[in-house]
Amino acid sequence: MKVKLITVGKLKEKYLKDGIAEYIKRLGRFTKFESIELTDEKTPDNASESENKAILDKEGQRILAKVGDRDYVIALAIEGKQFPSEQFAKELEQATLRGYSDITFIIGGSLGLSPKVKKRANQLMSFGLLTFPHQLMRLVLVEQIYRAFMIQQGSPYHK
């Protein structure tokens, strides 16, 4: 199985890069992990609705170009489903049992995700109604993916 994380925007903070690298290293025991950073579109401060839509469409095209036809896609969106960690672990396990060999996670840019990306997703997932910096969400998500694998192994890490 391969896990892929597609994100919009460049991660600059070293402490976040270090944390993500640590969890990717730990995940190496279970899966191949690929992280793909896509260029974000610059959003003017007073962007109109049509400008925002055009930005979402451009970013969405870049995202979808990196998604495989047979990938199981989980996109982060505020309106998505919230999972307890144990259920999230089962969701990943079920995806592989349904024949998906690649699981792709998507974190959009500052405007979120285009409707086309959301439509392509097999599952929309939310970490709640709070707003998080997109860069921090990468670390939180990668840790939760690692936690899911540890839960599947019956490891005490989750306790």
Swiss-Prot record:
InterPro entries documented for this protein: Alpha/beta_knot_MTases (IPR029028), RlmH-like (IPR003742), tRNA_m1G_MTases_N (IPR029026)
Residues holding S-adenosyl-L-methionine: L76, G108, F127, G128, L129, L130, T131, F132
Protein name per its UniProtKB record: Ribosomal RNA large subunit methyltransferase H
Subunit structure: Homodimer.
UniProt entry keywords in alphabetical sequence: Cytoplasm, Methyltransferase, rRNA processing, S-adenosyl-L-methionine, Transferase
Function field: Specifically methylates the pseudouridine at position 1915 (m3Psi1915) in 23S rRNA.
GO MF term list: rRNA (pseudouridine-N3-)-methyltransferase activity
Cited PANTHER family: METHYLTRANSFERASE, RIBOSOMAL RNA LARGE SUBUNIT METHYLTRANSFERASE H
Species of the source: Streptococcus thermophilus (strain ATCC BAA-491 / LMD-9)
